[in-house]
């Protein structure tokens, strides 16, 4: 057996159980430039488009259930109350609420007056009244399509840095992955889920509990986006709180080697932070590399030339077009016209691809 010297994880058995026989076309939050993000409508859209993976995010509620949301605080740009009014910013913390309380809100229509976020993602959305789904509802939706090859790449959103405003209400990573694991096993999805996180402690806990579940190590070094967007912190004296106790300096600042040390199956960096050398090194360690979040054709082609195994995009229809032009094998779409979340695969092409400072992926 081969062990990680840092974590005593048997990395010879922590291989990706997910079997990707096609390019991993990932619809970010279900495809937030075309359907309301992290809703059953966007997830159904991704399936019917022919995405390999539904990329999505999850939070743990006060009553111990997992719901699908990127932000731990309800996003005022997309959330309306029972009276149809957009909520106040920073008012509702999902981690301090029950599922019943959350189901009173609607997240299907973006506020057209919210500014840049609407310009980037809202203008091209088809909108629907939509509630925040639970992880179980996502699993049930996937099962309703009958396609046993659909993958869910699901992110835990933790803030392990004590200086972060969101730190104090973090769930316990061990408890979170236990609940996640129970749901995945309940729906027999072990070979069709990936757990991804910037908080590598979550990934460590997942591998300890169930090494059959694939994990993906996210990272970013974008100080202009804010302190929480610096996960590696290569040049600081203290170890980064994002890496689960690992010191990146022990790996010469190399996140590929560091991710391999915790038994990660996939590495997922921000797309401007990788090179052909990173791709080749990941492959030499039997790891896949799937950058995020890529929304224009030029960058997609650049990454494909490097040899990446997948791409996460807000514009999955555009990524599909790019891949088809290159004759890259894709997943076959599955259509379910009887699904209440079936909306077809129409899209609009009117929004810019990135914010002025390039940080649309960080919203």
Protein language model annotation of sequence segments:
Residues 1-363:
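Phosphate-group recognition and catalysis centered on beta-loop-alpha active-site segments
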